[in-house]
């Protein structure tokens, strides 16, 4: 198990946007943290009321958004216009190219969300978009599959051999990790104990094939687990 602490991440403050970068991104460059397997980006973003990312383009990337607090408004040139709220998972396959914008839907409250980039298995595909809601009850005290290559169990589909799980753990709740190959565990908020180590908000742990782990002692914790080929 290799732990990457929250305070080891890159950070950028643009006034309207405060962003932590788990892996190298924009002006933050660390050759030792360019990604993990197909997982390329985990950015924890806080966006001021009424602000956001204007129209910009992407190609050949699987982009997943996960809202923690507030409301995020998404628009793209495929004709999609949606508002995301906590518990929602959005997947956009950029493929041959997509133009989109993401804004804080509120003029009063902040927006806190994760943007995740995953390298695609196939390049040059037709761009597509998908958004689904995952109620608290489906994630409380257990792992809920929210993204997968085949879209099974009601998850959003991703153009890569990856399984993404979300879980909520409180009052000492615990859970064994689902079967995984390479695994990246990211604590979104709260605290958990993993193999005797306490991980807090923004902390992460990487596991190699054959390494086993379980979560214990969850306290108001929200956790994402990536199972990667």
What are these regions (language model features)?
Residues 1-229:
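Jelly-roll (double-stranded beta-helix
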């Amino acid at each position: 198990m290799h732990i990457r602490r929250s305070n080891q991440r890159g950070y950028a403050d643009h006034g309207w946007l405060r962003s932590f970068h788990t892996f190298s991104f924009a002006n933050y460059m660390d050759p030792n943290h360019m990604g993990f397997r197909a997982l390329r980006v985990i950015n924890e973003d806080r966006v001021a009321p009424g602000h956001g990312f204007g129209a910009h383009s992407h190609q050949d990337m699987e982009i997943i958004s996960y809202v923690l607090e507030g409301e995020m408004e998404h628009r793209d040139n495929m004709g999609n216009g949606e508002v995301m709220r906590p518990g929602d998972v959005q997947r956009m396959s950029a493929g041959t190219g997509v133009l989109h914008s993401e804004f804080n839907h509120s003029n009063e409250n902040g927006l806190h969300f994760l943007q995740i980039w995953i390298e695609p298995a196939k390049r040059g595909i037709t761009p597509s978009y998908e958004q689904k809601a995952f109620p608290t009850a489906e994630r409380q005290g257990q792992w809920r599959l929210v993204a997968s290559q085949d879209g099974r169990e009601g998850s959003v589909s991703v153009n890569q051999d990856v399984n993404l799980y979300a879980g909520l753990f409180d009052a000492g709740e615990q859970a064994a990790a689902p079967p995984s190959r390479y695994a990246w565990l990211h604590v979104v908020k709260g605290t958990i104990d993993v193999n005797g180590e306490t991980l807090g908000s923004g902390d992460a742990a990487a596991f190699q094939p054959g390494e086993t782990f379980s979560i214990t002692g969850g306290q108001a914790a929200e956790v994402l687990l990536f199972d990667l080929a």
